[in-house]
Design a protein with these regions (language model features):
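C-terminal substrate-binding/catalytic lobe of Rossmann-fold NAD(P)-dependent oxidoreductases
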Residues: 2, 10-42, 124-231
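Hydrophobic beta-strand scaffold residues
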Residues: 26, 71-72, 95-96
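Rossmann-fold NAD(P) dinucleotide-binding segment
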Residues: 40-44, 54-74, 82-85, 90
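Rossmann-fold NAD(P)-binding glycine/threonine-rich loop
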Residues: 62, 75-97, 107-115
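Rossmann-like NAD(P)H-binding beta-loop-alpha module
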Residues: 108-123, 141
Length: 231
């Protein structure tokens, strides 16, 4: 599989290493220096993986859609453009898989948090909350992962779930879901030890999206894998 990488910061470099380790090829690396040539450079690639910046997402989505190259969209801070991005992909009969977090562990954590919310919604006197912490270079707060957790939990607990963010040091990413009462407190925590899991998930999504048309969340990739491997 020939992969075009859009953005070559920390995540882009990790994805490049993961691509090569899997025996695939990095055919092109597109950064802000050559971003104007994106659509042209996409030619001959099987898939593109974008870990650039939120403000560049619409331009990148459109270039991939026009070039008929499936896109794994891993940038953060573009939720306000989500509806427009989906429209662009669908208008060009393109393909895109996106997600607030490409860690397989986080996507399983989503399901645990949602199931826990259903349980606590059935009893009284427990107050839900969400806490997240990341390195001080992360721009968006709350994180996309925290917002996704809140959306999932809100299905059972309503929209008013307090969500707190910390930006400090070199924290790869910690997300905590809590249920607090006068009698006790229950905490569910996901802690990323490195960004390697995000890169592995992005490559998994890249292999999955080939040959498909439409817009998908990474959660759908995980759902399909779970169904395929369930007894």
């Amino acid at each position: 599989m020939r992969v075009a990488l859009i953005g070559f910061g920390v995540m882009g470099q990790l994805v490049a290493a993961e691509v090569r380790k899997a025996g695939d090829e990095v055919g092109a690396v597109i950064t802000s220096k050559n971003g104007d040539e994106l659509e042209e450079k996409l030619g001959g690639h099987d898939v593109a993986i974008d870990f650039s910046v939120g403000d560049a997402v619409l331009k990148n989505v459109e270039a991939c859609a026009r070039a008929k190259v499936p896109l794994v969209e891993g940038a953060t801070g573009w939720k306000q453009y989500e509806a427009q991005a989906k429209q662009i992909v669908n208008e060009h009969s393109g393909a895109m898989v996106y997600g607030a977090n490409f860690s397989i562990g986080v996507n399983l954590f989503y399901r645990i948090a949602k199931q826990a919310s259903a349980l606590f919604a059935a009893v009284d006197n427990y107050s839900p909350f969400i806490e997240e912490a990341h390195h001080n270079r992360k721009r968006d707060a709350p994180s996309g992962t925290a917002l996704k957790l809140r959306d999932l939990m809100s299905e059972h607990l309503g929209p008013d779930i307090p969500t707190a963010s910390t930006r400090a040091g070199h924290i790869p990413g910690t997300h905590r879901v809590g249920f607090d009462s006068e009698a006790d407190q229950i905490l569910l925590t996901h802690t990323a030890r490195s960004r390697q899991g995000f890169a592995s998930g992005a490559l998994l999504a890249a292999h999955w999206i080939r040959g498909r048309t439409g817009v998908f969340e990474f959660a759908e990739v995980i759902d399909e894998i779970l169904k395929r491997r369930s007894p």
